[in-house]
């Protein structure tokens, strides 16, 4: 049975980069191309895990905006814990 838009998911991880001054970053694993897949996965694996999950495919653009806002807050030094991230993304999580 083919996947419908409602069952597709985007796997992602928010992490603190081990390089580049410890900035918080996100990687959307299921959207990586072959040319950047290995590098992006290695960067995430070296970093400090903050949050991961699956976003609903149909809501991915709105969810990415929320993720960007979370990253901005983290990179400004705000304390945003896992529960706050989950709450912010709740309506977009699969």
Where are each of the predicted segments found?
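Mixed-charge, Lys/Arg-enriched low-complexity segments
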Residues: 44-94
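Short N-terminal "domain-start" leader segments
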Residues: 1-46
């Amino acid at each position: 049975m083919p996947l419908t838009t409602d069952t597709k998911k985007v796997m992602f991880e928010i992490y603190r980069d081990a390089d580049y001054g410890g900035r918080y970053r996100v990687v959307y694993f299921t959207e990586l191309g072959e040319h950047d897949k290995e590098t992006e996965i290695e960067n995430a694996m070296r970093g400090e895990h903050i949050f991961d999950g699956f976003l609903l495919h149909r809501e991915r653009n709105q969810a990415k905006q929320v993720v960007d806002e979370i990253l901005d807050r983290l990179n400004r030094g705000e304390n945003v814990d896992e529960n706050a991230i989950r709450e912010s993304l709740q309506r977009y999580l699969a």
